[in-house]
Amino acid sequence: ALAAAFRGATAHWSGPRKGLIVSSGLGRRAMASQAAYCAGKAGLDHFTRCLALDEALKPHGAKVCSLAPGVIETDMQVQLRGADPAVFPDRAAFTGMKEKGQLATPDDAAARGLAFLNRADFGVNPVADVRD
């Protein structure tokens, strides 16, 4: 809905348009007990690939990218670190990232996303990782 609203509201613009969609590395990697999340993010990535193709057909089409922002300290992280290892075998990996200080803050992730949005090559790859 937001992508359609953006496209409709800016379709008449002759200047550059960019759309950044927040995805996840889990859209590209399967993980036990996270099927719905992984599938949702994978669908978002593929939607963005299709959207990029649609926009490329237009004279002033928007550049779009579904960006994996890295691992961020969120409520989801808290839930994953507290999950039963019998159903979430990756729990130790997430606990380790927290213990080693490898989780980005939401503010840091937002800053990295904005920096990615301003890269000269933004939109060349419709699905990317901020760590690329």
Question: Residue locations for each model-derived region?
Answer:
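Catalytic Tyr-X3-Lys loop
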Residues: 1, 20, 44
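Alpha-helical segment proximal to the catalytic Tyr-Lys
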Residues: 8, 53-57
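Flexible, glycine/small-residue catalytic loop immediately N-terminal to the helix bearing the conserved Tyr-Lys
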Residues: 14, 29-33, 55
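Active-site loop-to-helix junction immediately N-terminal to the catalytic Tyr of the SDR YXXXK motif
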Residues: 30-38, 50
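C-terminal helical subdomain
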Residues: 62, 66-69, 74, 82-132
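Rossmann-fold scaffold of SDR-type NAD(P)-dependent oxidoreductases
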Residues: 20-21, 65
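Residue(s) in the substrate-gating loop at a strand-loop-helix junction
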Residues: 24
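Active-site helix of classical SDR
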Residues: 3, 40
